[in-house]
Amino acid sequence: MHFRKYLVGGIRKVKKVVKFGGSSLASAEQFKKVGNIIRKEESRRYVIPSAPGERTPDDTKVTDMLYSCYGQAILGEDAEKDFEEQLEAIKERYNSIISGLDLELSLDEEFKTIRTNFSKKIGRDYAASRGEYLNGIIMAAYLGYEFIDAAEVIVFDENGNFDGDKTHEILSARLENTERAVIPGFYGAKPDGSIQTFSRGGSDITGSIVAKAVHADMYENWTDVSGFLIADPRIIKNPKPIDVITYRELRELSYMGATVLHEDAIFPVRKEGIPINIRNTNAPEDKGTLIVEDTCRKPRFTITGIAGKKDFASITIEKAMMNSEVGFCRKVLEVFENNHISIEH
């Protein structure tokens, strides 16, 4: 693998962006694993954390807890008790991580702000984003890295569409002289300062955006699996791992249901020729899956992978003389658009 390098004090070093998913940051124990991974390589300079995920199969992700808590806030006085109890449960999740890491850190002021903004019904995107925001504060304190609020550097327009050019301009300038930083994933802000999130799993996208901004040599995406498998292990017994896959192959698998990496995380790094390495926080010795633009390696299998999606509806349209009616397909597609229905073809 060829790495671009940069000079620091005359020493040539590799620069990496590392993103950790919710399962990798669900508890203090998982945080410690992440800390060991980051400290093992000096090149891991920019960290993108997700919100705490499930600690056990019957646990609840913090993002879902925040959605539920905000739902109680919207109900007002009738649900005030449930709102306070749920907010306290979220606070306890974070405090358990802080105490487990022996950090001298208090999130009391942050939770006062969250309580106030929830009461003002500030929006679901703000509510959901607090999971990554708070985890970012803890991660920065734990590592001794600078904390950068994603709302300051990830830009959306007034309609909630991601502004890649503006983000790259602001983020590149902000990180130009920043050696090490923690930037929460999943969210950014509109011009008026209101919080806007990516779709679920959007921390993958944030990591890719940061990798592009700092001209990283590698974007490592750490999760709870050792990369992509040829098939879903819940359906196929003992599927083989995929060592190397191209962006194009990954894009197809992502569209068809492979969920290890958010499908939109490919674009920013692909344009810059930055490879992505999917790694396992719980098995850091595994090499995982390397995602590249192209490879000259001869694949082990004719088929790279198999993926699928459930709950599709198949629609067949029949009409006499349809092939001679100009604009027919456009009219059909407009029906889907007007009803906010995406299509696969």
Question: Where would I find each of the regions flagged by the language model?
Answer:
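Glycine-rich beta-alpha junction loops
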Residues: P52-G53, V225-G227, I276, N280-E285, ...
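A conserved regulatory-domain signal marking ACT and ACT-like small-molecule sensing domains
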Residues: K287-H345
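Flexible, glycine/charged-enriched surface loops at secondary-structure junctions
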Residues: E104-L107, L261-D264, P275-P284, I317, ...
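Active-site scaffold of zinc-dependent metalloenzymes
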Residues: E272
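Nucleotide/pyrophosphate-binding catalytic subdomain
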Residues: K5-I266
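Generic beta-strand/beta-sheet core signal
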Residues: I148, P184-G185, W222, R279-T281, ...
